Amino acid sequence: DKSDKTELSNFEINPASAVNGTIYYNGTQDNHYLYAMNTATDGVSTVWDGNLWYPIVQGDYVYYMDVENDYRLCRYSLSRNEIEVLTNERIDCFNVGYGYVYYQVNGEEACLKCMRDDGSDSWVIAEGNYTAINMTSQYVYFQMFGDDSSWYHSPLGSQSYSVFDAARQAALDALKK
């Protein structure tokens, strides 16, 4: 009967990041501002009136795709109210953690790249279009766009990658059932 459920929003939100009981997301209706929802009170506040997509909060920084500037990758300092451009390349997706940012460059020379979380030392991990970038403390995992059956992984901060056979084998075993 849904009597124990509370509607938090009457429109779709992208809960891109959650930290200490706060969900951060960008606007999808009238603007692309950064919003925060306190999960204890269900209260929503505007954090920053930027034009951003897919915000990820790490410490004092909000990493995001800059909608106004062709989806380049930036970070915003919450305490200093300052924007830093990490790359001017147009990106499709990214993830950040453990001192690194992994991101998919869009365009004719599409590739998966890595940089330090301050924007320094970028390098190519793999040529082509990749998505579903996930990180652990030791590895980054990703898939080639359009191929849901294969996963790849790379030791965090390295320049090499390989097929993650355990994921492929689990998928094949599931198909046999």
Describe the predicted segments one by one.
Residues 1-3, 37-42, 76-81, 115-120, ...:
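Short loop/turn segments that connect beta-strands within beta-propeller blades
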Residues 10-20, 49-59, 88-98, 127-137, ...:
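Repeated scaffold domains used in trafficking and secretory/extracellular systems
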Residues 24-26, 63-65, 102-104, 141-143:
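Residue position within the beta-strands of beta-propeller blades
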Residues 30-36, 69-75, 108-114, 147-160:
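Structural motif
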Residues 66, 86-113, 117-134:
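Intrinsically disordered, low-complexity segments enriched in Gly and acidic/Ser/Thr residues
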Residues 129-177:
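Blade-level signature of beta-propeller repeat domains, shared across WD40, Kelch, NHL, RCC1
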